[in-house]
Regions:
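ATP-dependent phospho-/nucleotidyl transfer catalytic cores
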Residues: 124-125, 155-158, 162-246, 257-352
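Single conserved hydrophobic/aromatic residue that forms the stacking wall/gate
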Residues: 2-33, 37
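TRNA-binding/sensing appendages of the translation machinery
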Residues: 1, 26-29, 38-59, 102, ...
């Protein structure tokens, strides 16, 4: 006789009760022009009900807020199951034909909080609010911030990690994005060998966010992976353009839509240093330093490829896409740097010119943002002193000793010669450069006040 069927799996453990509501929630900042608070919702945002929902005090009717389970590779090692430890997905809304997910960060404990309290403080919440909006307006793919609320509660945090915790003001940010699905959502299912749920998640993601790729099939899954790679490459090239350093590029912090997500220990390059990272816990190995970010994206894509392999079952096809990324990211980086220099015509020596510039920028403390913005005023006829033009970018002009000065003058001579091959005049070139070289970035000291 056939063996008896296996016993049914045990029921899942009960979810913990919802976190207690904030004591006295009130608005700290809200974007009335944002995609979700406008027109008829603008008036609603003044209501007590609206404040209750966006502080986590109450939920929308007929909604079922949830926290997501995901895994991830952290600093190059598999960390197992992780999940939304202090993020709660409120709902998804549609506005002007676009789907938006609303997520609260800091509203309290979730099933994945482990030993943490699920809360956030005003200091880190302001950092996330400001940076996500700054990135959006600099043209960088990113999640956005809809609102920032004070909870009215005090939250205990050890800011300096020195064993002296202190109470800070609690706060809650509402994040907005088409989706908050991460690489880690796929990784955990592959690790659990749950092919059915993995397939369902991939199909859901394609249906709602990559529907142009067609109906689910092995070919569609490959096209999906390739487009995720392209979007991720576009994101990281923009990071390099504006000097943004994420700081914690674990696979659980990689958006499946190619958006910048999770603004934690981020920072902006001030003096140009390809080895810099803002993450103090990464200061020894500097895995996530500025100069390696494009390669870290490739490594993370490899982990996503491993997670998707059960649906494709041909490693060579996935490897081909990863090889394409390596080739294309080098080209994309070169084109991005050329745009920062106002170079639009092809020249076989451009890569050498850019490498020499990057090396010169590291000879002394040179402010990246100021340097490239000032460079837009350079005259192609070589009639001005390039070093004097960018002198505001040097933190200490006394560091510009004769050897460094000579290297800079040599580079500016080559740059002036190269500009002679361009079709745009100085005014047109300057205008083009100013569209990619920001005048202002969110300076680290401002974000840490």
């Amino acid at each position: 006789p056939p063996p008896p069927p296996p016993p049914p799996p045990p029921p899942p453990p009960p979810s913990p009760p919802p976190p207690p509501p904030p004591t006295t929630p009130r608005w700290y900042r809200r974007r009335q022009r944002q995609m979700c608070i406008r027109d008829r919702l603008k008036e609603a945002s003044e209501s007590q009900e609206f404040r209750n929902i966006f502080s986590g005090s109450s939920i929308l009717p007929n909604s079922n807020p949830y926290a997501m389970c995901y895994g991830g590779h952290q600093f190059g090692n598999w960390a197992g199951q992780l999940g939304d430890g202090r993020a709660i997905n409120l709902a998804e809304v549609e506005h002007s034909g676009q789907q938006w997910a609303l997520q609260l960060k800091g509203a309290g404990e979730t099933p994945y909080s482990r030993t943490a309290d699920g809360l956030a403080v005003l200091r880190s919440s302001i950092r996330e609010y400001l940076c996500s909006e700054a990135m959006f307006h600099l043209g960088v793919p990113t999640t956005r911030a809809l609102s920032l609320m004070l909870s009215g509660d005090q939250v205990l945090r050890d800011v300096m990690y020195d064993g002296n915790p202190a109470h800070e003001k609690g706060a809650i940010v509402c994040r907005v994005a088409p989706s908050f699905i991460r690489f880690g959502n796929f990784e955990i299912l592959a690790a659990q060998e749950d092919k059915a749920t993995l397939t369902a998640l991939v199909d859901h993601t394609i249906k709602h966010h990559y529907s142009h790729l067609g109906k689910p099939s092995k070919g569609t899954y490959l096209k999906f992976f390739k487009e995720v790679a392209v979007r991720s490459m576009d994101m990281v090239i923009h990071w390099q353009r504006v000097g943004f350093v994420h700081g914690v590029m674990n696979t659980d912090n990689m958006s499946i839509l190619g958006l910048t997500i999770d603004y934690g220990p981020y920072g902006w390059l001030e003096d140009y240093d390809r080895g810099w990272t803002p993450n103090t816990t990464d200061r020894t190995n500097k895995r996530y330093r500025y100069g390696t970010q494009p390669q870290i994206v490739l490594w993370n894509l490899l982990q996503l490829a491993n997670a998707l392999f059960p649906l494709i079952e041909e490693a060579a096809l996935l490897q081909d896409i990863l090889k394409e990324y390596q080739q294309e990211v080098d080209i994309a980086y070169l084109e991005m740097m050329k745009s920062k220099l106002g170079l639009f015509e092809k020249d076989k020596n451009d890569k050498i010119l850019i490498t020499e510039l990057e090396n010169s920028l590291e000879l002394s403390e040179t402010d990246m943002t100021i340097f490239f913005r000032q460079l837009g005023n350079f005259k192609s006829d070589g009639s001005q002193d390039g070093l004097e033009l960018v002198s505001k970018a040097f933190y200490n002009e006394k560091e510009i000793v004769k050897e460094i000065e000579a290297k800079w003058k040599t580079w500016f001579l080559k740059y002036a010669e190269r500009l002679q091959k361009e079709l745009k005049n100085d005014t047109e070139r300057s205008e083009s450069m100013n569209t990619v070289n920001p005048k202002y970035v969110l300076r680290n000291y401002m974000a840490q006040l």
